Amino acid sequence: MSMFCFQCQETAMNKGCTVKGVCGKEEHVAKLQDLLIYTVKGISDVVVKGKIEAAGIPEVNHEVLRSLFMTITNANFDADAIQKQITKMISVREGLKAKVQAAGLHDAALFNADGRDAMLEKAASVGVLVTENEDVRSLREMITYGLKGMAAYAEHALNLGKEDVDLYKFMYEAMASLLDNSFGADDLVALTLRTGEYGVKAMALLDAGNTSKYGNPEITKVNIGVRKNPAILISGH
């Protein structure tokens, strides 16, 4: 199987895209996205096992948000940009490791991949289907997608001057847990529920950012007629 992605509701045959995404995503882009997520999990492993306080690593926090946000549905299919981000996050990971004593690190916190070919080769061994148990796999991915959505909200909130260090703490904890094979289905169900809780907190943070900057939404009358002057077409996803 050249790729596997079932991140959205429009996947091929409602099972997953295995040759090319229905969205147009190419195989190599899907694999690079998988490796970027794996790299962020490795950073989380270092943060958790090295007992690093999220409040003390703001730049790392922001890069983690950016990395997760890059992999959401239809956000970024630029292979060069994703490859560059993988390289950056490996460097970030190594910088963290140099500052702490963290024993028993996972492969995600240890591997290196220099260049596109090496990255694609590594990506083939860390994709979604590496988790054989379907229930565990599904729960892990549900949590991952929840974290991606959370990162998107948190990134937008950050651009509005709002952030919450507790969100970063949870993200690191959750992503590190996704590397732990001792986490069974029951543990992952509990983590899924917590992911939802923090997702709501991220939404509240973004709402606070929007309302503090733009005010509270109000019912407003607008002209919906057609004119000859230029218009702006707005679409949503």
Where are these regions (language model features)?
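Metallocofactor- and cofactor-centric catalytic cores in central/energy metabolism, strongly enriched
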Residues: 1-237
